């Protein structure tokens, strides 16, 4: 640093260390100009000048070094790490951190976290991580503060499951560490701008069933029932959707939310987008969402296809209700599906089955392959001191697949 011809850094780092630079050294402030840094460094190298990029802590841990490595020759880089603020925070608290998950909540400020927030929210990765890890080390941002993180835990129903520690101004004047804060307390506190957060579980994480939940696990419309994809049809439909851990799923006509919520548990690194037009059913699906404890599920009140244009292209689409828009929804789903994706639909009436078959036939020339399975299940029922079988209504499960080699397209 003392011999560098060019020193690049943030406003604060340059001001803090400017007295160490050699006389005549050029300085570049990267604040708001990160994309220019590789060009500045490359230009200095071509001019046979030495260049130093200042970073705090370990630049290989959510720092600038990986970015520079992607845009410059790796062999041209020499990384000199310091202690990271996360290391220092754990040392202050005496906490082992080899098994902790590190999460950064830097990014565009999307405001307060709401249940069902989309993947673009700055707290989304953290909301997912708290479901899967016992201890988390969080690099905060000016918008996503410790207090907002605490409010996120409360919004997700995890206020009694985690404790927090907030380390402020580490290795600086005014250093302070708040240990064992309850989220309810931290949610209303103010902290110094320079801080990191540590989260750890105060009670064991639940290990929920991911697939094949009984119908009784879901709240349903009372006194009349029936607006639920029942266990047998749900299990077959989810199997035919060919879900992966990171799948993007659409659930059109969510009703109670049973298919979409189970898909969310099966796709912990993916996301489920659900829509329901009936207000009462939407409220029930929201109730089930709150009970299921998944953060990768967004539920919308509306009638498809309105609103679907803003959803990301799906790997799988489930249509449980069409609101009279079936042919158009099928065409939209097949157009938006990613290559190798699957469309699954459930029907109990001849009219909807015939409409679906006609719509799918019209897409056969595009390489769409489809089939129909009639599911006829019967469940045992007591009769006196014996048992009999009571038939459930037959369900047609209609499945269509998009060729793996076919390019996806937008709306």
Identify the residue ranges that each predicted region occupies.
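Glycine-rich SAM-binding Motif I of class I
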Residues: 257-261
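Class I S-adenosyl-L-methionine
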Residues: 2-88, 263, 269-272, 276-279, ...
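Class I SAM-dependent methyltransferase SAM-binding "motif I" and its flanking Rossmann-like core
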Residues: 57-133, 305, 366-390, 394-399
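Beta-strand/loop-alpha-helix module characteristic of Rossmann-like adenine-cofactor folds
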Residues: 6, 76-77, 86-219
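S-adenosylmethionine
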Residues: 277-279, 298-379
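Core SAM-dependent methyltransferase catalytic element
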Residues: 196-202, 382-411
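Conserved SAM-binding loop
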Residues: 285-286
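Conserved class I S-adenosyl-L-methionine
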Residues: 246-255
């Amino acid at each position: 640093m003392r011999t560098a011809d060019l020193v690049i850094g943030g406003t604060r780092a340059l001001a803090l260390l400017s007295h160490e630079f050699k006389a005549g050294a050029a300085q570049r402030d990267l604040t708001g100009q990160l994309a220019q840094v590789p060009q500045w460094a490359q230009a200095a190298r071509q001019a046979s000048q030495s260049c130093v990029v200042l970073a705090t802590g370990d630049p290989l841990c959510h720092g600038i070094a990986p970015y520079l490595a992607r845009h410059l020759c790796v062999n041209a880089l020499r990384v000199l790490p310091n202690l990271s603020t996360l290391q220092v925070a754990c040392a202050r608290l005496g906490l082992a951190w080899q098994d902790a998950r590190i999460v950064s909540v830097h990014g565009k400020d999307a405001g307060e976290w709401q249940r069902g927030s989309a993947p673009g929210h700055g707290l989304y990765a953290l909301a997912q991580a708290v479901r899967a890890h016992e201890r988390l080390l969080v690099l905060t941002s000016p918008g996503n503060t410790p207090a907002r993180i605490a409010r996120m835990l409360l919004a997700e129903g995890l206020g009694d499951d985690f404790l927090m520690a907030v380390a402020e101004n580490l290795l600086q004047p005014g250093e302070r560490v708040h240990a064992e804060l309850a989220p309810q307390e931290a949610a209303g506190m103010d902290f110094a701008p320079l801080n990191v957060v540590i989260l750890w579980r105060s009670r064991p994480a639940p290990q929920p069933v991911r697939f094949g939940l009984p119908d009784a696990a879901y709240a349903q419309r009372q006194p009349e029932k029936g607006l639920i994809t029942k266990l047998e049809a749900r299990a077959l439909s989810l199997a035919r959707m060919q879900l992966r851990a990171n799948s993007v799923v659409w659930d059109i006509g969510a009703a109670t939310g049973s298919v979409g919520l189970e898909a969310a548990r099966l796709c912990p690194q993916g996301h489920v987008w659900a829509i329901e037009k009936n207000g009462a059913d939407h409220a029930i699906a929201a109730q089930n969402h709150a009970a299921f404890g998944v953060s990768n599920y967004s539920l919308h009140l509306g009638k498809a296809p309105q609103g679907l244009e803003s959803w990301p292209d799906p790997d799988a689409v489930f249509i449980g209700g069409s609101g009279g828009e079936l042919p158009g929804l099928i065409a939209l789903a097949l157009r938006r599906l990613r290559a190798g994706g699957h469309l699954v639909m459930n029907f109990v009436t001849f009219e909807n089955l015939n409409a679906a078959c006609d719509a799918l036939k019209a897409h056969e020339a595009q390489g769409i392959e489809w089939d129909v399975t009639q599911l006829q299940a019967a469940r045992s029922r007591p009769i006196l001191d014996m048992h009999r079988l009571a038939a459930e209504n037959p369900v047609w499960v209609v499945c269509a697949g998009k060729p793996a080699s076919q390019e996806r397209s937008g709306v």
